Swiss-Prot record:
Its EC number is 4.6.1.12. Its cofactor is a divalent metal cation. The lineage of its organism: Bacteria, Pseudomonadati, Pseudomonadota, Gammaproteobacteria, Enterobacterales. Involved in the biosynthesis of isopentenyl diphosphate (IPP) and dimethylallyl diphosphate (DMAPP), two major building blocks of isoprenoid compounds. Catalyzes the conversion of 4-diphosphocytidyl-2-C-methyl-D-erythritol 2-phosphate (CDP-ME2P) to 2-C-methyl-D-erythritol 2,4-cyclodiphosphate (ME-CPP) with a corresponding release of cytidine 5-monophosphate (CMP). It comes from Pectobacterium atrosepticum (strain SCRI 1043 / ATCC BAA-672) (Erwinia carotovora subsp. atroseptica). Binds 1 divalent metal cation per subunit. This is 2-C-methyl-D-erythritol 2,4-cyclodiphosphate synthase. It catalyses: 4-CDP-2-C-methyl-D-erythritol 2-phosphate = 2-C-methyl-D-erythritol 2,4-cyclic diphosphate + CMP.
Length: 165
């Protein structure tokens, strides 16, 4: 069993679409980023890569590489997941916390879970997404951006049993 933690944050800005968990959310601004700025998928990708000891999203998809400019984060997640599968892992479970004052995430969470389950080739019961605010404290509370944390549990595909390291 391997556990990974991921964190991502992006500042609001620009006129691009707001994409969170692979869902386009109507809002006045997008998030500033080299790719599409999807904080959920970036945090999830980092959690999974960390659990598999494959580095992080910046190592795999550097923001200095023009090939990833404006990249669809679902594609990045699927490529990371392919590499993790190649190491013999499957998802045990995934828990995601979105931290944002606005917009409200609750109406979009079911589709985020569907997207994550599709991309990670797992059952929706293995994926949890929730959202919270910071009660108007800090940069997310002031509406300056969105943050996300993710924790992923990986298990070996062959047996599905706990592996002690």
């Amino acid at each position: 069993m391997r556990i990974g933690h991921g964190f991502d944050v992006h500042k609001f800005g620009g006129e691009g679409p707001l994409v969170i968990g692979g869902v386009r959310i109507p809002y006045t601004q997008g998030l500033l980023a080299h790719s599409d700025g999807d904080v959920v998928l970036h945090a999830v990708t980092d959690a999974l890569l960390g659990a598999a000891a494959l580095g992080d999203i910046g190592k795999l998809f550097p923001d200095t590489d023009p090939a990833f400019k404006g990249a669809d984060s679902r594609g990045l997640l699927r490529e990371a997941w392919r590499r993790i599968n190649d190491k013999g892992y499957q998802l045990g479970n995934l828990d995601v916390t979105i931290i944002a004052q606005a917009p409200k995430m609750a109406p979009h969470i079911p589709q985020m879970r569907v997207n994550l389950a599709e991309d990670l080739q797992c059952h929706m019961d293995d994926v949890n997404v929730k959202a919270t605010t910071t009660e108007q404290l800090g940069f997310t509370g002031r509406g300056e951006g969105i943050a996300c944390e993710a924790v992923a549990l990986l298990v070996k595909k062959e047996t599905g049993e706990i592996v002690a390291w």
